[in-house]
Amino acid sequence: MKAPLRALICQGIEALRSNGTLPTNTLPPDFVVERPKTRKHGDFATNVAMLLSKATGSNPRLLAQTLVAALPTSADIARIEIAGPGFINFHMHPVAYQHETINVLKQDNDYGRNLSGQSRTVGVEYVSANPTGPLHVGHGRAAAIGDCLARLLEANGWNVKREFYYNDAGVQIDNLVRSVQARARGLKPGDALWPTDAYNGEYIADIAKAYLAGDSINMVDTIITSTKNVDDTAAIHHFAVNYLRNEQNHDLAAFNVDFDIYFLESSLYKDGKVEETVQKLINSGHTYEEGGALWLKSTHFGDDKDRVMRKSDGSYTYFVPDIAYHLSKWQRGYERAITELGADHHGSLARVHAGLQALEIGIPPGWPEYVLHQMVTVMRGGEEVKLSKRSGGYVTLRDLIEETSTDATRWFLIARKPDSQLTFDIDLARQKSNDNPVFYVQYAYARVCSLMHQAHEKNLNYDQTSGMASLDQLSDNTSLCLMIEISRYPEIVQIACELLEPHLIAQYLRELAHAFHTWYHNTPVLVENAVERNAKLTLACATRQVLANGLNLLGVGTPEKM
């Protein structure tokens, strides 16, 4: 509903330019149209007069009065007030919210979507777990946040490419291989010959057992079969990494998370992209050698100190393949790139940005954008859950899904701002009560389905056309409050995308569900009067549609029965 108001205000500014009140070179400023905290200050407010007064040297309150007088008339606006130093407050007529409720049903699944992204390409990378063990709850939070961000960006008109970066090179992979090899040779954690820094979870024994049995792994484009040779380190490496990739993919599929691109870190070395990137940085003049190592002049690009790229032994530090990887994103045409990571990666961001800037190929500052999430604490029975027998040291995503559900796990992992620490209460997530937010929201959806089923069972035919035409019959305050809440949805979708804060969708859905439950308890719906009944069912169906659209952005289901 903000867009028509903005257009109206711009028409008023143009009228003042035309009659000489404003200089002809006065452009509409980047003004705000927002919903005040309380409706007594109006449904919407704008600071446009105060911004214009700065540009023209006018009294902002007088300019506000002049601008209001120049606004075209609108049936959607009941009255306009000037407040404080020059705020313009708009009080909307109920018909405006009735029209918006009708728009919901006309636009159906597209309600709330916009074209602000203009079909530009954005790469969203998330999860990107090392294939060294089961996905833990932190990976689950990354999956929930990243997948919701991708859905939000698509809803805002972006062409989204979902990407998973496999860190399948480095010391941790070497430790994995040595762990599986030791298990295959009959060793166990605690044995004298058990490797240092080995992984101790039961999943290592599972991999070794599968390897010794000659099992095959069905990957997307190939089948990998074990050689059963415990001395063949390369074969164990290939089998173990792909076994865990397959396990991770299984968990992500159960979590309703999919990707367009799976990118292997090892491919950067295999294809010579790491060496090629280093040579580009040398050629750009932003490196130097010292102490037998190759350094990046990262302080020239905002980092707090220069960084070693290639150590004296010839090996690369971990951020060098990260630069090569993000360079590949740029070369693949990503006008925008967003990387979702755990907050423990914070220290690497500046050096990756510095490396990309040092390439001097037109990559804009701040590309890629980063969304960092804080840790998750899992609670059961009032106590923290720290260990998983399968993983040997942490709570897995699979544990949470099996103990609660995919819907509950996704909701709880997305419900807080990414940079806030999160407590996952297993007991609460399993409750079928209004205290459980995902149950509360899904129950609102199911209630509408129940209403429609009851109407059918009672032979109370629903006429949506009549209902749309009769929304003015709903003059009570709870109906108006529900319509107002519905109308906020497109704004929330846009704001959540702009801020990269998908938890705002979850917050909004709780507020919408509360407005609906309040309306439901205060309003008999299946009344005898057909006109009134159709209007109420139309409002209920519009609520259901917005709930469905919002839950879809979260990747959470819409059960018709609870």
Swiss-Prot record:
InterPro entries: aa-tRNA-synth_I_CS, Arg-tRNA-ligase, Arg-tRNA-synth_N, Arg-tRNA-synth_N_sf, ArgRS_core, DALR_anticod-bd, Rossmann-like_a/b/a_fold, tRNAsynth_Ia_anticodon-bd. The keyword Protein biosynthesis applies. It is found in: Cytoplasm. Its main location: cytoplasm. It is an enzyme of class 6 (ligase). Its EC number is 6.1.1.19. Keywords: Aminoacyl-tRNA synthetase, ATP-binding, Cytoplasm, Ligase, Nucleotide-binding, Protein biosynthesis. A motif ('HIGH' region) lies at residues 129-139. It catalyses: tRNA(Arg) + L-arginine + ATP = L-arginyl-tRNA(Arg) + AMP + diphosphate. Gene3D superfamilies: Arginyl tRNA synthetase N-terminal domain, HUPs, Isoleucyl-tRNA Synthetase, Domain 1. One of its GO terms (molecular function) is arginine-tRNA ligase activity. Belongs to the class-I aminoacyl-tRNA synthetase family. Monomer. NCBIfam families: argS. This is Arginine--tRNA ligase. The gene is argS.
